[in-house]
Amino acid sequence: MRFTLMVTGPAYGTQQASSALQFAKALLAEGHSLESVFFYREGVYNANQFTSPASDEFDLVRAWQQLHDENGVALHICVAAALRRGVTDENEARAQGLPGANLQPGFQLSGLGALAEAALTCDRVVEF
């Protein structure tokens, strides 16, 4: 089956993003296809490369990047939600007059159209 995940919880503070990552890994291990992960609302914090967990904590931001690097899973973050929460890439930082970017490599700013397209082309959309 072909899946898309939507993550609305931040990297830390709730279980949503961690559960989504575990689910994503389980899908791939079982031979399913994971087309994309769409981060929305507080979920965009999963793409903030300035997140720096303690040395004894799991680094969820880098784990999402690793999932992308190893499996080619597209990691989309809602551009409107991201800008409201201070997460941006170089292009948006320049356009908004911000001093710098903090989008973790492997993630891409996208509109809700990316989620709509994924929902149309996948068998299941699972929200965390």
Swiss-Prot record:
Any Gene Ontology biological process: tRNA wobble position uridine thiolation
Q: What is its main location?
A: cytoplasm
Q: Which GO terms describe its molecular function?
A: sulfur carrier activity; sulfurtransferase activity
**Keywords attached to this entry:** Cytoplasm, Transferase, tRNA processing
Q: Which EC numbers characterise this protein's activity in its record? A: 2.8.1.-
Q: What class of enzyme is it?
A: transferase
* UniProt-listed PANTHER family: PROTEIN YCHN (PTHR34874), SULFURTRANSFERASE TUSD (PTHR34874:SF3)
The Swiss-Prot or TrEMBL record describes its family as follows:
Belongs to the DsrE/TusD family.
Role summary: Part of a sulfur-relay system required for 2-thiolation of 5-methylaminomethyl-2-thiouridine (mnm(5)s(2)U) at tRNA wobble positions. Accepts sulfur from TusA and transfers it in turn to TusE.
Describe the protein's quaternary organization and the partners it interacts with: Heterohexamer, formed by a dimer of trimers. The hexameric TusBCD complex contains 2 copies each of TusB, TusC and TusD. The TusBCD complex interacts with TusE.
Name of the protein in question? Sulfurtransferase TusD
Q: Which gene encodes it?
A: tusD
